[in-house]
Amino acid sequence: MAQEKSALSKAQKAAVLLLSLPEEVSMNIVKELSEEELQKLFALAKDLESVPEEEIENIAEELLDEIKKAGIKIKKPEEFIENIKKVIPPTLAEKFRGILELGDAEKILKEIEKVDSRILASLLKNEHPQTIALFLSQLSPKKSAEIIQNLPEELKKEVVKRIATLENVNVQYVKELAQILLEEISSLGAKEALKLEGTAVAAELLNTLDKETRELILQSIGQEDPLLEERIREKMFTFEDIRKLSDRDIIEILKVVDKNTLMIALLGAPEDIKQKFLSNMSKRAAKLFLEDMEALGPVKKSEIEKAQRQVVNIIRKMIDEGKIEIGD
């Protein structure tokens, strides 16, 4: 259905659009108009009757059609920032530039996430541990954990320790390092810092590792810096921490956790943790659950640990959402 042409003149349409824009937008336009242009607009505006919403929409659509016909293209964000520097504070312009840099870094890091973790580990292993820590802190915990598992043993501990003590990350630096890595991989076939809580990043990363590797790294860190080890552990939630949950919390977990995943997870669990779940089921449900567990037969240790991590991830998500609370 064709839109109905407005009977207003182009100058009147300009006045209508200006008056219908949000104040902060219209004020920026007004700053760019000459005194003569403003006088004309206000003269037209005072004579305008109330304009229906539908007509305002039609006028806006007409303007878009005119823009398309004229072949006007949207400015690059960098050019736009240069233009608006005239009417916004310098600090705000710098903030916008930082956002652009962050966006560029995120695009490059998305490409890095697709690269085989073993290749990334082999490229990173000769970098300084601090450089590796900075880089891994900007990747997903899963990807970071995979890379760490492929690093030399002594380097693993050093990298996690440095992640835990990070406070600021320069976006531009991470972006440049990621770009270099991508270039090296290809050859094989916000000015503002991001604020980080290093211990939280390290804890999230360690939670994705298998229990043996996790404990080895934590113990190594503890030998050099017991306080740092304690701070990391405080941020973590492990399968053994289920003991700290109340019966009410266990009931909430049972509502959302996959039954088969829980069965496999409990195959390798201490008896008290197993009973923690069974005691919060009805007698009939607990009996059926145990029968189904026995019917599973032998399960690989790696599958049990994977199931335990899945249960932990659900619990951590519920803690973050405030649905359950971890006790002392």
From Swiss-Prot:
One matching Pfam family: FliG_C
Membrane association type: Peripheral membrane protein
Site positions for Part of the EHPQR-motif: 162
Highest taxon in the source lineage: Bacteria
Entry GO MF terms: cytoskeletal motor activity
GO annotation, biological process: bacterial-type flagellum-dependent cell motility; chemotaxis
SUPFAM superfamilies registered for this protein in UniProt: FliG
Keywords: Bacterial flagellum, Cell inner membrane, Cell membrane, Chemotaxis, Flagellar rotation, Membrane
Subcellular location as annotated: Cell inner membrane; Bacterial flagellum basal body
Family: Belongs to the FliG family.
Protein name: Flagellar motor switch protein FliG
Species of provenance: Aquifex aeolicus (strain VF5)
Name of the encoding gene: fliG
